[in-house]
């Protein structure tokens, strides 16, 4: 009888421990969603919270390319489509609801400039050709923009190969961004850290 009682007590303790662990895991899962590529998903609210702690850098791939689509071009064939422009405008509106204070940059291609224009809804932005060159030097270029922006949040319209490079270099994951997908980084003590993939909403 004593042995049965001890086993029963141990089982109750085990079940209590297991239940507690499951509660913790459930809590973590509800707070941190993950993309299929292994990057944490960061929505607007999480981005706003991060921006209160450090300057954030959000790097967007440009909107839908005209020369790779059957959809109507906005204007120049090397730019974006009408659908892409509308998507960029909707994205900019949603983004600005959570992050109002940021400086905007674009690489020097028609598609990124048009994407930034429609995203900004009239906000001025700076064209920087270095945002086209994506390799180990991209971090120095981003830090230069942060200094110019006096460590404000910055948004950059760039290209898929830039986002792919950063995801692989910083977290060792394969990231194949679609149009207007984005990565979130933050600056701390002069270093850049990749936090995850921006997911509007």
From Swiss-Prot:
Top-rank EC class of the record's enzyme: hydrolase
Name of the coding gene: ais
GO cellular component: a single term: periplasmic space
Protein name: Lipopolysaccharide core heptose(II)-phosphate phosphatase
NCBIfam families found in the cross-reference section: PRK15416.1 (NF011945)
Keyword rRNA-binding assigned: no
Lineage: Bacteria, Pseudomonadati, Pseudomonadota, Gammaproteobacteria, Enterobacterales
Organism: Salmonella paratyphi A (strain AKU_12601)
InterPro entries for this protein: His_PPase_superfam, LipoPS_heptP_Pase
Pathway(s) this gene product operates in, as recorded in its UniProt entry: Bacterial outer membrane biogenesis; lipopolysaccharide metabolism
Similarity section: Belongs to the phosphoglycerate mutase family. Ais subfamily.
